[in-house]
Swiss-Prot record:
Chief location category: nucleus
Annotated region described as Disordered, given as residue ranges: 76-139
Organism name: Rattus norvegicus
Zinc fingers (TFIIS-type) by residue: 259-299
Biased composition (Basic and acidic residues): 76-93
Domain TFIIS central span(s) in chain numbering: 140-256
Primary gene name: Tcea1
Protein name in the entry: Transcription elongation factor A protein 1
């Protein structure tokens, strides 16, 4: 069953990428006949694919069925209500029930209210794994939330994924604030570094992982620059560290003075060289050379 849901999700994702939702209705009907579970919903992330189709499609039948599916799946995420909750709901005054959003939605002839509620339900599906961020009236914090949400909108990944970038931005900011407890320079620098890394064109996977929930907001709020770096940058840092270790080894051994090498910078022959085994034992050693005149360094195998 999981393979079937994954297959449908992949097809929908391709439709969103190609901006062609032809055949989406048939896929949605297939999903409707599949008994969905919470585990299946979380492991396949089918909700994101359905929400992306819902947002892109102009076919009323497609959007209506997508909304219906998302609404039914939302109940799985919320969990079953207890008997106590049911009893309390029965005891509520009739006037309260009539004034509730649910009652107004059922009795109202306006489709605007209904569509807004469905939109909220759909967006809630993807942030329900984490508690919603508390509201704030602090202007600095509100501005930071806006900037984080804007950074999450870099590219169009959030559309295909179906993530609520505004809520995610608020959750990230809330986690930062809860750790630092004020909006001083440390707080601003933390927010600024998150924004910079989310916008990094060379590191799109970081943004996608945050939008998909692979990196939770509270973890992302605490990540170091090294942890947020792209794979390319991590590899570069690793190589630089190795190089620094080799140079340190060369400095410790002192080296051998020679006139066999000519400095490419000052053309003098007053040099010191050291040989270090940097690769496997059956390969040639690497020779590190330092010019004693100008300090120029080079190496060769």
């Amino acid at each position: 069953m999981e393979d079937e849901v994954v297959r449908i999700a992949k097809k929908m994702d391709k439709m969103v990428q190609k901006k062609n939702a032809a055949g989406a209705l048939d896929l949605l009907k297939e999903l409707k006949n599949i008994p969905m579970t919470l585990e299946l919903l979380q492991s396949t992330r089918i909700g994101m694919s359905v929400n992306a189709i819902r947002k892109q499609s102009t076919d009323e039948e497609v959007t209506s069925l997508a909304k219906s599916l998302i609404k039914s799946w939302k109940k799985l995420l919320d969990g079953p209500s207890t008997d106590k909750d049911s009893e309390e709901k029965k005891k509520e005054p009739a006037i309260s029930s009539q004034n509730s959003p649910e009652a107004r939605e059922e009795s109202s002839s306006s489709s605007h209210v209904s569509s807004r509620k469905d939109e909220t339900n759909a967006r809630d599906t993807y942030v329900s794994s984490f508690p919603r961020a508390p509201s704030t009236s602090d202007s600095v914090r509100l501005k930071c939330r806006e900037m984080l949400a804007a950074a999450l909108r870099t590219g169009d990944d959030y559309v295909a994924i179906g993530a609520d970038e505004e809520e995610l931005g608020s959750q990230i900011e809330e986690a930062i604030y809860q750790e630092i407890r004020n909006t001083d320079m440390k707080y601003k620098n933390r927010v600024r570094s998150r924004i910079s890394n989310l916008k990094d064109a060379k590191n799109p996977n970081l943004r996608k992982n945050v939008l998909c929930g692979n990196i939770p907001p509270d973890l992302f709020a605490r990540m170091t620059a090294e942890e947020m770096a792209s794979d390319e940058l991590k590899e570069m840092r690793k190589n630089l560290t190795k190089e620094a270790i080799r140079e340190h080894q060369m400095a410790k051994t002192g080296g051998t003075q020679t006139d066999l090498f000519t400095c490419g910078k000052c053309k003098k022959k007053n040099c010191t060289y050291t040989q270090v085994q940097t690769r496997s034992a059956d390969e040639p050693m690497t020779t590190f050379v330092v010019c004693n005149e100008c300090g120029n360094r080079w190496k060769f195998c």
